[in-house]
Amino acid sequence: MSRTRTSGTVLSQRALNRALLARQHLLGRRKASAEKEIEHLVGMQAQVPNSPYVGLWTRLEGFQPNELAELINTRRAVRLGLMRNTIHLVTARDCLAQRSLYQPLFDRAWQTSSFGRNLVGIDVSAVIAQATVFMKERPRTFSELGRLLQQRWPDRDTTALAYAVRYLLPIVQVPPRGIWGKSAQPTWTSAEFWLGRPVATKSSHDKLVLRYLAAFGRPPLATSRPGRD
């Protein structure tokens, strides 16, 4: 059996496994609010809309789906692209505090993507500004947003125009997407508009790493460098 040596202590694979499960609150259900649990986990994978409900039910004593649904409906929790630009569920506080930490990662992904190459030669900041206006009118699907933007940039691909917004602007999916027992197309708006507060322009990598360590333990180096890997 392979072992890891840390500060003179030999940890078995089972000990490491138990430590991870304990950090993840998976050794037994505990009494806590869904909001506090989401923050402890530094967000929850939500690419599949109902997966956070299962994750919270697994961890929390007496959890009911309407508790999370209420957090989403009252804008205390939101769904947005974060780690690896996949959809995560986070509290409103963490959305506003963390989103800027991942922007360098999104910028590099955009520059090397086919979507980014399609928009070479135009002012992408103007695309973002126009998209913000459209989303303030009402939340939009990406297909709708792409068609609206193409009216101004008719020689550009609608998907590339819409994905510029996904990569370069903090946006959130709005309910009923993500509500237990309901289904809807992903519909988006500005995080700042939805939450009524600005996204932080400067946040602490160190604080995020410490929270990650509390929830997951020691990660690979690249994982501990959000926005830089």
Regions found by a protein language model. Name each.
Residues M1-D229:
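Long, low-complexity intrinsically disordered regions
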